[in-house]
Amino acid sequence: MTSAFEFDFYNGFSPNGDGKNDYWNIPILDYFAENNVTIINRWGNEVWITENYDNLINRFEGKNVNGDELSDGTYFYILEYNNEEKRGWVFIKR
């Protein structure tokens, strides 16, 4: 079975409304519809969480769970799918 550890994806995006890189694209999840994605700020607080991330509608656009824009900077993620977990960072720059 395919593993996320075999795939690279961009760690940054620019949700500024210009139509380019406005959301965090995670291509591997196109193959694993059942997944969980959690975004954590530098203080360890979960700021965004979802099930079934799909890169189309259900995707991280640099906003928290209330729809407020997050500050530019580095955030951490936990990606869970297919009984695997990947952790890393993602950078927001508007």
Per-range role (PLM):
Residues 1-94:
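Short loop/turn motifs at secondary-structure boundaries
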